[in-house]
Curated annotation (Swiss-Prot):
GO cellular component terms given for this protein: chromatin; cytoplasm; PR-DUB complex
Gene: caly
Site (Important for enzyme activity): D228
InterPro entries: Papain-like_cys_pep_sf, Peptidase_C12_UCH, Peptidase_C12_UCH_sf, UCH_C
Positions of the UniProt region annotated as Positively charged C-terminal tail required for binding nucleosomes: 405-471
EC number: 3.4.19.12
Amino acid composition bias (Polar residues), ranges on this chain: 314-326
Catalytic activity: Thiol-dependent hydrolysis of ester, thioester, amide, peptide and isopeptide bonds formed by the C-terminal Gly of ubiquitin (a 76-residue protein attached to proteins as an intracellular targeting signal)
Entry protein name: Ubiquitin carboxyl-terminal hydrolase calypso
Length: 471
């Protein structure tokens, strides 16, 4: 379905843009100017993205949501701390029979009540190649705003699309300039060339036989929802026990889903979790540890000073009072406080290293993004042109072609050798009929003269050696 044109699409575009007046032929670009597109082709110009947690983390930051990150999940049984939701990506070679079974399995849990659908953020994917952004928004816009700062763009989108149909919500996403430009700024140059070659009507997330597709799993009002932009309705997998976390319910659903899929078709998948920025929790823990360190250190100094005054004969000295109720001087000796202070120093060093590792990861996310989005075509063409101008390009090409020719020649020789070995082995099993004509003539002449057939040189030498030993 094309998002361009139509009353609902124009209305959604105006609402999502926050009533910003834009020219029909205006060019939209990111802050760096790396991505530009005509306004008329906004919904048709979305590019395909890779499934990478670093890319998704930077994309969330570009959306204006700074306190969130995306992590890849390698083990379903490993506990994950405070996830907002999960994004399930699978590469799927579609088959009608397997597709029908999955549809029949999920059709029973469709939520078709319009009031229930409008109370959550569920958007149908009506814009090609926008499935990555759809999956992220399906998680973020269904979270409690008290626990998550969405930023201006996402907050405005959530407010203005409240009460819209899933189709119009999908159109609003596709026609939001900030989202489109942020999305395309992380695409590889090959994705743009592929879009220009195939046209905007083809989506790797929707229309091809072999497709990458994103599905979101989010807890909403005590129920586990599966939000798939290619399905007509959201899916409710039900609640979980009071003694369980919602992730336990998710694990069971995923185990069942993977069992169905792998039993019917070839499926390759990965799983990502949308979680709070780990640096926030580490920074908060470091602040608490340093506060405790200061308290323990101050108490220890006062205790040592009091002990020194007591040893000097000052009977009026009293044991120091601690500034908080964290430590009671009567309950700890100087040795206990020194041991506690050492443990705090170790914990601080460990968490400082964790914070450094997280910052290094963010830096590598940016480095990988620069390498991913950079267009190397000009460099490669210039490099090859310089080699050709210097007259060494042909020689380099021939050098790289010669090994392949040698390998192919060796392969042919090996095949011929195997065939000859097979023929000789087969001939040796036929007994006397395998003797050569020359050998048959020698044996006939020896029999005619009344002599035994001549021995081979090896046997002749062996007989001479035996005679020498007897002598």
């Amino acid at each position: 379905m094309n998002a361009a044109g139509g009353g609902s699409g124009a209305q959604a575009a105006g609402v999502a843009a926050g009533n910003i007046s834009l020219s029909h032929n205006a060019l939209l670009s990111t802050a760096s100017g790396a991505t530009t597109m005509p306004m008329a082709q906004l919904a048709d110009g979305w590019l395909e993205l890779e499934s990478d947690p670093g890319l998704f983390t930077l994309l969330l930051k570009d959306f204006g949501c700074h306190d969130v990150q995306v992590e890849e999940v390698y083990d379903l049984q490993k506990p994950i701390e405070s996830p907002y939701g999960f994004i399930f990506l699978f590469r799927w070679i579609e088959e009608r029979r397997a597709r029908r079974k999955i549809v029949e399995t999920t059709a029973e849990i469709f939520v078709k009540d319009e009031e229930a659908i409008s109370s959550i953020f569920f958007a149908q994917q009506v814009v090609p190649n926008s499935c990555a952004t759809h999956a992220l928004l399906s998680v973020l816009l269904n979270c409690n705003e008290n626990n998550l700062q969405l930023g201006d763009t996402l907050s405005r989108l959530k407010t203005h699309t409240k009460g819209m149909s899933p189709e119009n919500k999908g159109l609003a996403i596709g026609n939001t300039p900030e989202l489109a430009c942020a999305h395309n700024s992380h695409a590889m140059p090959q994705a743009r060339r592929r879009l220009e070659r195939t046209g905007a009507g083809v989506s790797s997330c929707r229309f091809t036989g072999e497709a990458f597709h994103f599905v979101s799993f989010v807890p909403i009002n005590g129920q586990l929802f599966e939000l798939d932009g290619l399905k007509p309705y959201p899916m409710n997998h039900g609640g979980w026990e009071d003694s369980e976390d919602w992730t336990d319910k998710f694990r069971r659903v995923m185990a069942e889903r993977l069992g169905i899929a792998t039993g019917e078709q070839d499926i390759r998948f990965n799983l990502m979790a949308v979680v709070p920025d780990r640096r926030i929790a580490i920074t908060h823990k470091l602040k608490m540890l340093r506060t405790n360190q200061a308290i323990v250190s101050g108490t220890l100094q006062k205790l040592l000073k009091a002990d020194e005054q007591g040893e000097s004969g000052n009977g009026d000295s009293q044991r120091p009072d601690t500034p908080t109720t964290l430590l009671e001087p009567s309950a700890f000796t100087a040795r206990d406080l020194q041991s506690l202070l050492k443990n705090l120093d170790t914990e601080i060093a460990i968490n400082e290293q964790h914070l450094t590792d997280e910052n290094d990861r963010r830096h590598m996310f940016k480095v990988d993004a620069s390498r991913r989005t950079h267009n190397y075509d000009k460099f490669i063409c210039t490099f090859l042109s310089m080699l050709a101008h210097q007259g060494v390009l042909g020689e380099l090409v021939s050098q790289h072609l010669l090994p392949s020719k040698k390998v192919s020649g060796q392969g042919a020789a090996n095949r011929i050798s195997k065939q000859s070995n097979t023929a000789s082995a087969g001939g040796s099993t036929t007994g006397a009929s395998a003797s050569t004509p020359k050998t048959q003539q020698q044996q006939a002449a020896a029999a005619k003269n009344g002599k035994s057939p001549s021995k081979t040189p090896g046997r002749r030498r062996k007989g001479r050696n035996k005679c020498r030993k007897r002598k």
